[in-house]
Regions:
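Juxtamembrane boundary at the C-terminal end of a transmembrane helix
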Residues: 141-152
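Polar low-complexity intrinsically disordered regions enriched in Ser/Thr and small residues
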Residues: 55, 119-122, 142
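Central hydrophobic cores of alpha-helical transmembrane segments
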Residues: 85-91, 113, 130-139
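Membrane-helix boundary connector in multi-pass membrane proteins
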Residues: 97-131
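A broadly tuned preference for mixed-charge, low-complexity surface segments
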Residues: 78-82, 125-127, 147
C-alpha cells in the first residue's frame, strides 16, 4: 500500500517567506547601520559623524525596514499575486544601490527579493516574482559592492 500526498509548493514557499521576514529585516538593518557606525567609531581617528547623525541614519534604516518588512511584505503575502509589488521594490532597491548610504536601498532590494522568492510558485504573477527575485538579489549584491567600494 502506498500513500501519496501532494505538496502545495506555493503554500510552503509563502510560509517560509513569512518566517524569513524578521531575520531578513534584522540583517538588513544591521548592514545599513554598519556604514554610519563605521564612520562614527573608527578607533585611530576622530569620528566623521556625530551621535546625532548616527541616530538619524539608524532611524531612516529602522523606518524603511519597518515599512517594507512589517507592512508591505505581510500585506503583499496575503494577496493572490504579489509579483508587481516585489518587482517594484527590487527595481528601486537595485537602481538606488549606489546611494546605499541613504538608508533605504538595501531594504527595498532585499524586500523585493524575498517577496519575489515567495511568489516563484504562485499561480498568478509567477513571471514577475521570478524577475523580482533575480533583480532583488542583484540589488542586494550591488548594495554590498557599493558599500565595499567605499573601503577599498
Amino acid at each position: 500500500m502506498s500513500s501519496s500526498h501532494t505538496v502545495d509548493l506555493n503554500s510552503s514557499q509563502l510560509a517560509s517567506a513569512r518566517r524569513l521576514i524578521w531575520p531578513t529585516a534584522a540583517v538588513i538593518f544591521l548592514f545599513t547601520v554598519s556604514y554610519p557606525a563605521n564612520d562614527f567609531a573608527p578607533p585611530p581617528s576622530p569620528p566623521d559623524i556625530g551621535l546625532g547623525m548616527l541616530l538619524v541614519y539608524a532611524a531612516i534604516a529602522a523606518v524603511t525596514g519597518g515599512v517594507v518588512f512589517a507592512w508591505v511584505l505581510p500585506w503583499a503575502l496575503r494577496q493572490e499575486s504579489s509579483g508587481g509589488v516585489a518587482l517594484a521594490l527590487a527595481v528601486l532597491g537595485t537602481l538606488l544601490a549606489p546611494a546605499f548610504w541613504a538608508g533605504f536601498p538595501p531594504a527595498l532590494a532585499a524586500g523585493g527579493a524575498l517577496l519575489g522568492w515567495a511568489g516563484i510558485h504562485a499561480r498568478k504573477g509567477r513571471s514577475l516574482s521570478r524577475a523580482a527575485f533575480g533583480i532583488g538579489v542583484l540589488g542586494v549584491h550591488f548594495n554590498v559592492a557599493s558599500y565595499a567600494a567605499v573601503f577599498i
